[in-house]
Structures are given as C-alpha cells and as structure tokens.
C-alpha cells in the first residue's frame, strides 16, 4: 500500500473543511423570507435556519385561527427554502472538489 498519497488526501480534507466553514459563515448572513395570507404574515430565516424576523398584520390579531394557518404556512415555506439552500450549497461544494 502506498501511503505517500495520504498527505494529499489530508490537504484535500483540510481544503474542504475550510471551504465548508466559509460557506457556513456566508450562509449565516443569507436571509430567506416567506409570506402567506397575501403578505399578512411574513417570516424570515437566516441560512442556519434560525427565525430572525416575524411580521403579523394587525388585522389578524382578532382571528386566531387564520393567524395560526398563515403562520404555519409561512414557517413551513421558509423552512423549505432554508433546506433547499443547504442542499444547493452542499452540491456546489462537492462539485468544486470533484473538479480537483
């Protein structure tokens, strides 16, 4: 077995780790906003999936059921956007290393 190539593998792994850290830092600043109820509810997530903003139209304060439905819809859409973005970043990162 030729162990001389392990140094190259170690360097490749270090490069992947560094790129992943950079992408995660950049992703943290990415904002995904979803709206429901014609914009009556708006939620924003950062790229890490943390809820960073929530807006609810005052007219919904009287209608708890509608507010719950709109909140669930907006939150689910926002979560899906974050997950889709994560998948795209992972595929892009793997694609970059496949070129090496």
Curated annotation (Swiss-Prot):
GO cellular component, one term: bacterial nucleoid
Keywords: Cytoplasm, DNA-binding
Pfam families hit by this protein: YbaB_DNA_bd (PF02575)
Main location as per UniProt: cytoplasm
Location of the protein in the cell: Cytoplasm, Nucleoid
GO molecular-function terms, A-Z: DNA binding
Its job: Binds to DNA and alters its conformation. May be involved in regulation of gene expression, nucleoid organization and DNA protection.
HAMAP family recorded: DNA_YbaB_EbfC
Family stated for the protein in its record: Belongs to the YbaB/EbfC family.
Oligomeric and partner information: Homodimer.
NCBIfam families listed in its UniProt record: DNA_YbaB_EbfC (TIGR00103)
Name of the protein this chain belongs to: Nucleoid-associated protein HPG27_32
Native source species: Helicobacter pylori (strain G27)
């Amino acid at each position: 077995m030729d162990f001389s190539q392990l140094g190259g593998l170690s360097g490749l792994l270090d490069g992947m780790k560094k790129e992943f850290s950079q992408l995660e830092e950049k992703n943290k600043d990415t904002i995904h906003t979803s709206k429901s109820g014609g914009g009556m509810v708006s939620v924003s997530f950062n790229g890490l999936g943390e809820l960073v903003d929530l807006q609810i139209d005052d007219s919904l304060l009287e209608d708890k059921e509608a507010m719950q439905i709109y909140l669930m819809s907006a939150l689910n859409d926002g979560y899906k956007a974050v997950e889709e973005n994560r998948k795209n970043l992972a595929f892009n990162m793997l694609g970059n290393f496949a070129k090496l």
